[in-house]
């Protein structure tokens, strides 16, 4: 038998990764070049602006830009459409693919037009997952896409691979979200699959239609895994055939002897209808468990909310229980996970000849692309939904990130979308608002709608699903999508709106580093939605200074003011007018202001779960942030964002208590030499407000050679500027 390392090479995962590793070796590190890239309208402006400042000439690989987030253009005057116009001009200038507003959500366009078996796609969205179609997808912050645009690589340690073994077949009423929520619940808290690749196989795969597989696959992001891949079969071949790309299919199977670092077994026969309660997809129960003990379970959610928000909000979920039944206020079926043809078809079957009624409960459905929307219209699905009282809306990611269908205060929305993080649905706790999202499968949402808003498992009702299989019509994309790859026109002028601004100046690290704590968060996990809110805030994504005004605004409202004060004092220091208090603090550790960087710092137990959006890090940098300190980073992508924006990703040992407060200082001597010299830790000093000095060991490994230089230079743009001068 081969050794484990030899047999790991026989996984589908390693077959694809090694084929994309420019080093061509079988070592412990990989330098990956991707086949294509995806971005949406929250991220592509910043990526292109960064790439331009770093020497971009043209797009070297297919790069599709979709407009599915701020595509309603409902807030901020012209700024959202200004970004869309910029995107089209960039596609023309540099040779990109431009998908106009509301034609498709980012990941459905990739499934329809971009994926190929054995390929790899990098996306500036955390839910970049196409493994069910034989294409490994990776979600990262914009800096990693910039590297690919400049013909550089995605550098990773060779990952572990976990086998997800599927058996059985789901019964009627069970959908992909039920399986996905169960998977997230099983592995999230333990970190069992963190930064690993999930490889799906087993006899149960053949029993799942493509939309079902896609629905599970897209949610693997919520497990904190690195990527995913599935075995391919006739069902996958059919997907490529109907999308008129049969040449992009090939069979993918592991070798005869393949080694996996772990295994998850899922018996689809036993899958129950699920509900993930606020404030995470892992906070999951079977719907029957909720029905059996609703007051206790909902009271636990209330208590969690009070711990998070204190007296800023008033929450009353238990009032949703009436006569032992739990009532929802809103239902949503949307986005890359929810708005599939099969989900909408089965929801329509459940609601056929039913009514959602005329009371408080409302429901909306968002087909995930225009081809899917056209098929629901052609096949009578839209008619059945509309007759039941469902509002049908365009391909739009709004309900998934707080830019559409924000519920009423204290409202409970059940959604087939990807996340239910705090305030991600759009509520503003600073204004006393709170609304809550529970994740459910489209089938159970439809059953709930048919039952007047009483939360109901679709397995508990009778219905017949008789809709025809999906047929894809390419005409709308042929007519509307700008296909510019290999057709760049460098004479094309980029079109700028008044909100599109360049990045402000960022400084290299000096010999020493003094940090002032501007936020200390002891929540178990801090999401990127808390670090920088989504929703209407993201309309300012192309204006770094204006967007940074919202950093941590829903979790630590005083953070921006503190950071601005720290940044102002650092600028005075750089101008030779160092504030006396900074001189005094440095004197306590025998240092001076001339060779010591000064910036703000965020401490959180486990930051970075959720979105890949680089603004979670860049906004800190724009405000003068120089470091994060934590016990561990929730995801690789957030840590990479920190590095690419020159924020040193410190960690501390798990047995060390971090009992410091905003206004305390952390001094890190010799940090520049430590980073450039290949060291992995530093002996720091905490200077507390009362003058007490405490030792603190900080770790910052692993870092590649390039990442060390990026940190020393202050950010990725500075790094490329320095390279271009050589």
Regions found by a protein language model. Give the residues of each.
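Fe-S-dependent hydro-lyases/dehydratases of central metabolism
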Residues: 1-726
């Amino acid at each position: 038998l081969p050794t484990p390392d030899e047999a790991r090479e026989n996984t589908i995962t390693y077959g694809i990764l090694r084929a994309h590793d420019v080093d061509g070796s079988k070592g412990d590190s990989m330098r990956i070049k991707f086949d294509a890239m995806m971005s949406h309208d929250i991220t592509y402006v910043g990526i292109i602006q960064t790439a331009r400042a770093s020497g971009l000439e043209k797009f070297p690989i297919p790069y599709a830009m979709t407009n599915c987030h701020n595509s309603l253009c409902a807030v901020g005057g012209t700024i959202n459409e200004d970004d869309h116009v910029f995107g089209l001009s960039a596609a023309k200038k540099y040779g990109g693919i431009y998908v106009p507003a509301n034609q498709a959500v980012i990941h459905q366009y990739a499934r329809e037009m971009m994926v190929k078996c054995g390929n790899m796609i990098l996306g500036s969205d955390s839910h970049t997952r196409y493994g069910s179609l034989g294409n490994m997808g990776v979600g990262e912050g914009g800096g990693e896409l910039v590297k690919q645009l400049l013909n550089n690589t995605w550098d990773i340690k060779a990952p572990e691979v976990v086998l997800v073994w599927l058996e059985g077949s789901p019964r009627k009423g069970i959908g992909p979200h039920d399986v996905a929520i169960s998977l997230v619940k099983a592995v999230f808290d333990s970190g069992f699959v963190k930064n690993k690749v999930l490889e799906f196989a087993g006899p149960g795969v053949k029993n799942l239609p493509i939309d079902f597989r896609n629905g599970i696959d897209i949610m693997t992001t919520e497990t904190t895994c690195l990527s995913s891949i599935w075995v391919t079969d006739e069902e996958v071949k059919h997907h490529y055939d109907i999308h008129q790309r049969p040449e992009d299919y090939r069979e993918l199977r592991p070798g005869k002897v393949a080694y996996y670092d772990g295994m998850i077994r899922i018996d689809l026969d036993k899958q129950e209808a699920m509900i993930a309660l606020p404030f995470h997809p892992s906070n999951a129960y079977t719907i029957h468990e909720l029905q059996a003990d609703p007051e206790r379970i909902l009271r636990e959610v209330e208590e969690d909310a009070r711990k998070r928000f204190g007296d800023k909000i008033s929450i009353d979920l238990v009032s949703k229980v009436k006569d032992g039944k739990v009532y929802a206020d809103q239902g949503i079926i949307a986005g890359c996970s929810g708005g599939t043809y099969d989900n909408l078809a089965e929801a329509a079957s459940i609601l056929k000849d039913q009514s959602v009624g005329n009371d408080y409960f409302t429901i909306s459905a968002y087909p995930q692309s225009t081809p899917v929307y056209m098929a629901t219209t052609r096949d009578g699905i839209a008619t059945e939904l509309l007759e039941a009282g469902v509002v049908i809306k365009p391909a739009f990611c709004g309900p998934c990130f707080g830019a559409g269908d924000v519920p009423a205060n204290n409202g409970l929305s059940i959604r087939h979308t990807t996340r239910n993080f705090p305030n991600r649905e759009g509520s503003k706790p600073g204004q006393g608002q709170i609304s809550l999202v529970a994740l459910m499968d489209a089938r159970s949402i439809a059953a709930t709608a048919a039952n007047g808003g009483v939360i109901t498992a679709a397995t508990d009702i009778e219905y017949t699903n008789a809709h025809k299989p999906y047929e894809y019509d390419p005409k709308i994309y042929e007519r509307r999508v700008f296909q510019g790859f290999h057709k760049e026109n460098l004479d094309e002028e980029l079109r700028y709106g008044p909100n599109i601004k360049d990045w402000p100046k960022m400084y290299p690290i000096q010999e020493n580093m003094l940090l002032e704590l501007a936020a200390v968060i002891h929540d178990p996990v801090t999401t990127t939605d808390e670090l920088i809110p989504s929703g209407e805030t993201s309309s300012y994504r192309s204006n770094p200074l204006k967007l940074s005004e919202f950093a941590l605004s829903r979790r630590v409202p005083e953070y921006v003011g503190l950071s601005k004060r720290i940044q102002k004092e650092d600028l005075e220091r750089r101008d030779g007018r160092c504030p006396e208090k900074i001189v005094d603090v440095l004197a306590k550790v025998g240092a001076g202001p001339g060779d010591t960087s000064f910036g703000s710092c965020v401490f959180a137990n486990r930051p970075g779960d959720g979105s890949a959006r680089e603004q979670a890090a860049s906004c800190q940098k724009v405000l003068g942030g120089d470091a994060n300190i934590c016990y561990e980073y929730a995801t690789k992508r957030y840590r990479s964002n920190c590095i690419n924006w020159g924020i040193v990703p410190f960690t501390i040992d798990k047995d060390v208590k971090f009992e410091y407060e905003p206004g305390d200082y952390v001094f890190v001597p010799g940090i520049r030499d430590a980073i450039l010299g290949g060291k992995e830790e530093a002996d720091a000093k905490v200077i507390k407000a009362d003058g007490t000095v405490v030792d603190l060991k900080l770790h910052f490994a692993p870092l590649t050679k390039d990442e060390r230089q990026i940190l020393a230079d202050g950010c990725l743009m500075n790094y490329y500027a320095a390279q271009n001068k050589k």
